[in-house]
Amino acid sequence: MNAEIIAVGTELLLGQIANTNAQFLSEKLASIGINVYYHTVVGDNNKRLQQAIEVAEERADMLIFTGGLGPTKDDLTKETIASSLAEELVYDEKALASISDYFKRTGREFTENNKKQALVLDGATVFANDHGMAPGMGLNKNGKVYILLPGPPKEMKPMYVSYVEPFLRNFTTGENIYSRVLRFFGIGESQLEVKVQDLIDGQTNPTIAPLANDGEVTLRLTAKHQNVHEAEKLIQHVEDLILERVGEFFYGYDQEFLHYKAIELLKKKGLTLACAESLTGGLFGNQVTENAGVSSVFKGGVICYHNDVKQHVLHVPEEVLSTDGAVSKECARYLAENVRELLKADIGISFTGVAGPDASEHKEPGTVFVGLAIKDEPTVVFPLNLSGSRQQIRERSAKYGFYHLYKKLEEI
């Protein structure tokens, strides 16, 4: 079954609030085998909402509306749909009693417009609103399913979980949806796609969906099957084919982010870490400490932004700073080695470079060096040539630090 989500509210079009309901519903619907191919946002306008309904009826089996069920004049979702379907609106006695009781308990006047919230489509299944006033409803008519939900997420989400999803399962095939996200770093989206293009072109079940986000690339594998274990087998087969080709860039699944994977491996190896940050100004250390229990492996860091700190605290030779410059392979090497020794850690990592927007030391923005000094191992410096805004370059540099740390830890 194919669905369209129609969010109603001028405040959404004006950007005053984000349409988080659509994200929530899309994820939930996918998990029970309902495809969402369109998101529509329409303002509080009867004519435009009617047009949106007509368009959606041409391309979807299920229309899911959020918003416009309240007591004011511009809350017109129910009225517009009732007119479109030639259905009457009738009072739901349970909802009316619940709303009336609320006003009695709070000592407020129960005005006529508040009674409007208890109106539902005649013949609809009513979804109780346990966290607000206006009930939701579902109606199957003319081969289409119409779902009306309140706009506030704190009302809509629990209503969906408790009442709507069980109702929707009557319209599904019983197939289970299983998804797995593969996370990659150090390879661009276009490069990765080239290596797995034939798999993407031939996808059926499971499907393969690439997504690039802030220097990372993910592949979401999604399979449908009535037996979840069989769905997992379908996923695993395609994953194996993908990792045969781009496994060197793979680092984790789903919500396993780079900093988490690197720190977990650090704990597993029983090694300690120290960082020297010039370019990143503490971003790397901040992400390290987002991980619980990290004090067992993280000694600390030095923000060595000024050359005086590089020279007098981390003992980068003056001739390196004056000849090679602070943005250099040699400087990164000294920073990594000396912060490791200073803080008595097993591993030292360093970041130096040009974040921009202007050049520095005759080096262009995006010129970055990440140093990695591991006890009893040769020091390695990774030169990077990054693009983006000042903040993006700094954040991506920190990510590359975690990536190279993770890959090096895998080797030892």
From Swiss-Prot:
- Gene3D superfamilies named among the record's database cross-references: 3.30.70.2860, CinA-like, MoaB/Mog-like domain
So which domain of life are we looking at?
Bacteria
**PANTHER family reported in the protein's UniProt record:** NICOTINAMIDE-NUCLEOTIDE AMIDOHYDROLASE PNCC, NMN AMIDOHYDROLASE-LIKE PROTEIN YFAY
InterPro entries per record: CinA (IPR050101), CinA-like_C (IPR036653), CinA_C (IPR008136), CinA_KH (IPR041424), Competence-induced_CinA (IPR008135), MoaB/Mog-like_dom_sf (IPR036425), MoaB/Mog_dom (IPR001453)
* Cited HAMAP family: CinA_B
Q: Which CDD domains match?
A: cinA (cd00885)
Its name, as the record gives it, is Putative competence-damage inducible protein
Q: According to its UniProt record, which protein family does this protein belong to?
A: Belongs to the CinA family.
Gene symbol here is cinA
